[in-house]
A protein has these predicted regions:
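Long, low-complexity, intrinsically disordered segments
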Residues: 667-673
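Solvent-exposed, non-transmembrane helices and loops of integral membrane proteins
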Residues: 644-667
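Membrane-embedded helix-loop-helix hairpins and adjacent transmembrane boundary segments
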Residues: 1-630, 647-651, 671
Length: 673
C-alpha cells in the first residue's frame, strides 16, 4: 500500500513526487511545511537522548573545564550530534544504511541480554502481572475493555493511530531516504514485508523496560529501592529545571526533607494544596515539589513534571539492571541515538535542498555543488536541533509533542500522498487546501497549548468569557466521553495533541475530496508517472497480472505477481498468515468472547504474556539468526552493485512538465510514437 507505487514513480523525495503529480509551487509549499514540521519535531530528539544518558548514567548536571562551568546536557548533545554529522557527511544515504545495518546486527545479541536480565530480575506471574493489575477501575493496563478513564492514552488514542496508518501512509519523512533505496518497486515492497519480522528482541526489550520500570516503582516488594530512585530523581530534576535563585527555597525545603524525613510546615502546605490535573497518588514527592515551584513559576513547574515523568523509567532502570547489563543497555542506546540522528538529519536536510532550494533555483547544480550544499544544510539542521533542545522547555508528553509538531505536516499530507498515488481526480487546489487547513489547525494547537497557562486562561477569566468557553468546549466533548473528555482547567489546554492531530487529519481528507472534485477538469496520466505500459523504462521487468478468478483470488489478495520468487511467496504467506490468523484473528475472537462473557483480569495477564512475550520471543530467536546472516549477505551484494552502478547526472531531483528530468527524453520518444 503506497510503498510500491511510490517507488514506481522513481522519485527520490516526496517533494519530487508532488511536482510530478501536482505542481512545482505545491512541491515548494509542501516541502516548506514538511521541513518545518520535521526539523522542529526532530529538534527535541537530542534533548531527550542527552537527558536520558545524564539520568541513566548519573552524570553531573555541570562539569568544570579549564575553569569554565559547562552544562553536561549541552556537551552530550554536541558530542552525539557532531558524530552523526560526520557519519552523514562521509557518504550520505549509503553510509547511513551500512552503518544502521552493522549496528543492527551488533545489537541483536545485546537486546537478548537485556531481555534475559529483566526476566531473571522480575517474575511475570509474581511481580509484573500483579503490579499491572493493581489499577483503579477504568485505568487497566492489561484489559482493553477497562480503559475508559485513561485521558491521554485510551481507545481514542489507538483509533487515531489506526486512522493515521491508513490516511497518512508514508507521510512521515524522517526516514524518506529508505523509501526510494530499493533496487526496484518489488524489492521495496518485499523490504516492507521483511520488516514484520525484523524487530525481534528489540520490541520485547522496549516493552519489558517499561513494564519492569513500572513494576519496580509500584510493587511493594521493591518499595525501598523505588523510594530511593524517586528521591534521587526528584532532586536531580529540580536542580535540572530550577536553576534560578527564585527556586532556592524550594530546593532547600526538599533537601531538608530528603535528609531528615521530616516535613516542614511549608512542605505540608504544598502537599495539601496540590491542584494539578495530573497529580498521582504514587508520586506525592513529585506533586509536592511541583506545587511549590508553581507558586514561583507555573511553566517551570510544568517542565519539572514533564522531565520527572520522562526520566522516571531511566532512573529506575539504573537501579534495576545489574553491572554489565547496565553498560550493555547504555551501548545500545548510544547506537540508537547515532542511528536516529544520522537518518533524520539526512532526511530533513535532503528535503530542504532537493525540494525547496533546487526547484526555486530552477536550474541544475553540478554534482559537487549539490553535495556540498547538502552537507552544509545537514550541519545546519544539527545546529538548530542543538539550540532548540537547549532552550525549549517541554510541556507535554514526548509522544504528544511528536503528535502536535508532526501534525503541522501530517494534518494534511496523507490525502495528498494517497490521493496522488491512487486517485486520478486529485488536483493541486485540493492538495493546497488540505495542507493549509491541516497546518493552521496544528499550529493553532501548538500556540494554544504553549500560551494557555500564562495568557489564554487568565485572559478568559479576567474578561468574563471563561464560563461561556467552558460550556461550549466541555459540551462538544460530552457525546464522546469517556474517550474524549475536554475540561477547561487553569494548568493545561483542554484538547490534547492527539485530538488536535485527528481534527486536522479529518479536515484534510474532507477538503481534498471536495476541492479536487470542484476544480478537476481532466484525469491525471497515472501510467506515465508510474512508468507502466508504454512508459516502462528499458531493462525493467514487465509485471504480468493474472485475471481474477476463484483460483487466483488468494494470490490477488496477497499481491503476488510474476515478480515473486519462491522465497518471496513463502515470506508473503508467512506474514499474511501471522497477521490475519494470529493478529487479526485473535482480535476478532477476543472481542466476541469478551462481549459475551468478559474475561477476568488474570486471564488478560496470561494473554498479555503469551501475545507480547512468548510468541515474540520464539520469533525473535529465529529472526536474530536469520537477519544476522541475511544482513551480512545483503551488505556484500550492495557493495557489488555499487561497483557496477552507472551514474546519471540528470537524475538529480528536477522535474520538467510533470516528468523527472532523466525521463524527459524517454517520454518524448514514447508519446511521439
Amino acid at each position: 500500500y503506497c510503498i510500491y507505487r511510490y517507488r514506481e514513480t522513481r522519485a527520490m523525495t516526496m517533494g519530487q513526487f508532488f511536482e510530478m503529480r501536482y505542481s512545482r509551487g505545491f512541491r515548494i509549499y509542501a516541502a516548506s511545511l514538511q521541513s518545518l514540521s520535521g526539523v522542529v519535531n526532530y529538534a527535541i530528539f537530542p534533548a531527550v537522548g542527552a537527558r536520558f544518558l545524564i539520568y541513566y548514567c548519573d552524570l553531573p548536571l555541570h562539569v568544570s573545564f579549564f575553569g569554565w562551568v559547562l552544562p553536561t546536557f549541552a556537551l552530550v548533545m554536541a558530542l552525539f550530534l557532531s558524530a552523526a554529522v560526520i557519519v552523514v557527511s562521509l557518504g550520505g544515504q549509503i553510509t547511513i544504511m551500512v552503518t544502521d545495518c552493522i549496528l543492527g546486527i551488533l545489537s541483536y545479541p545485546l537486546y537478548a541480554i537485556v531481555v534475559i536480565a529483566l526476566l531473571v530480575k522480575f517474575s511475570w506471574s509474581g511481580d509484573m502481572a500483579p503490579t499491572l493489575l493493581d489499577r483503579p477501575a477504568g485505568e487497566s493496563m492489561l484489559n482493553p475493555f477497562d480503559i475508559d478513564q485513561l485521558r491521554n492514552f485510551n481507545m481514542f488514542y489507538i483509533f487515531v493511530g489506526l486512522f493515521s496508518n491508513v490516511f497518512n501512509r508514508m507521510a512521515w519523512s524522517g526516514t524518506q531516504g529508505y523509501n526510494a533505496a530499493a533496487v526496484n518497486a518489488h524489492e521495496q515492497k518485499m523490504g516492507a514485508v521483511l520488516g514484520t519480522w525484523r524487530a525481534g528482541f528489540q520490541t520485547m526489550m522496549i516493552l519489558l523496560l517499561a513494564v519492569a520500570g513500572y513494576t519496580f516503582l509500584n510493587n511493594d516488594d521493591f518499595a525501598e529501592g523505588a523510594a530511593a530512585a524517586r528521591q534521587e530523581l526528584t532532586w536531580k530534576a529540580v536542580n535540572d529545571v530550577a536553576a534560578d535563585a527564585k527556586f532556592d527555597a524550594v530546593k532547600t525545603e526538599l533537601r531538608s526533607y530528603l535528609d531528615t524525613g521530616e516535613m516542614t510546615p511549608e512542605l505540608a502546605t504544598w502537599s495539601e494544596g496540590i491542584h494539578f490535573e495530573d497529580k498521582d497518588e504514587n508520586e506525592p514527592l513529585r506533586d509536592m515539589v511541583k506545587e511549590g515551584m508553581a507558586i514561583q513559576d507555573k511553566s517551570a513547574a510544568q517542565t519539572f513534571g514533564a522531565i520527572h515523568d520522562q526520566m522516571r523509567v531511566p532512573m529506575a532502570l539504573r537501579h534495576i539492571l545489574p553491572i554489565g547489563v547496565t553498560g550493555v543497555f547504555c551501548a545500545l542506546c548510544i547506537f540508537l541515538l547515532i542511528s536516529t540522528d544520522t537518518t533524520y538529519m539526512h532526511s530533513w536536510g535532503s528535503i530542504i535542498v532537493q525540494d525547496i532550494v533546487l526547484p526555486v533555483r530552477g536550474r541544475a547544480f553540478t554534482p559537487q555543488q549539490q553535495l556540498r550544499l547538502l552537507r552544509l544544510v545537514i550541519a545546519g539542521v544539527a545546529a538548530f536541533a542543538f539550540f532548540f533542545s537547549l532552550m525549549f522547555a517541554q510541556v507535554d508528553f514526548i509522544l504528544m509533542f511528536f503528535a502536535i509538531t508532526g501534525a503541522i505536516w501530517l494534518g494534511g499530507a496523507g490525502p495528498c500522498i494517497v490521493g496522488g498515488l491512487y486517485w486520478r481526480r486529485g488536483t493541486s487546489a485540493g492538495a493546497f487546501a488540505t495542507l493549509t487547513a491541516g497546518s493552521i489547525l496544528a499550529v493553532g494547537g501548538i500556540i494554544a497549548q504553549k500560551t494557555w497557562v500564562e495568557h489564554i486562561y487568565p485572559w478568559l477569566a479576567e474578561t468574563g468569557r471563561l464560563g461561556g468557553v467552558t460550556t461550549v468546549v466541555e459540551g462538544l466533548s460530552r457525546p464522546l466521553e469517556p474517550y474524549v473528555e475536554w475540561r477547561v482547567l487553569p494548568d493545561k489546554f483542554p484538547i490534547n495533541s492527539q485530538e488536535i492531530y485527528f481534527i486536522a487529519m479529518l479536515t484534510g481528507v474532507v477538503l481534498y475530496v471536495i476541492v479536487s472534485l470542484l476544480t478537476g477538469k481532466e484525469q491525471f496520466n497515472m501510467e506515465r508517472m508510474l512508468h507502466r505500459g508504454k512508459y516502462r523504462r528499458a531493462g525493467e521487468e514487465e509485471v504480468i497480472h493474472e485475471e481474477l478468478t476463484w483460483k487466483t483470488a488468494y494470490r490477488k489478495i496477497l499481491g503476488i505477481n510474476s515478480q515473486y520468487t519462491r522465497g518471496d511467496r513463502i515470506l508473503s504467506w508467512s506474514v499474511f498468515l501471522y497477521s490475519m490468523l494470529w493478529g487479526f484473528g485473535s482480535f476478532v475472537v477476543l472481542t466476541i468472547w469478551n462481549s459475551i462473557s468478559p474475561w477476568p483480569d488474570s486471564w488478560w495477564a496470561n494473554w498479555f504474556k503469551i501475545y507480547n512475550l512468548v510468541v515474540p520471543g520464539i520469533i525473535a530467536v529465529v529472526s536474530t539468526v536469520w537477519f544476522t546472516i541475511g544482513g551480512a549477505w545483503d551488505l556484500r551484494r550492495l557493495f557489488q552493485r555499487l561497483e557496477t552502478k552507472e551514474e546519471d547526472h540528470l537524475d538529480d531531483g528536477r522535474v520538467v512538465g510533470h516528468v523527472s528530468a532523466d525521463d524527459v527524453g524517454h517520454v518524448h520518444e514514447v508519446e511521439g510514437d
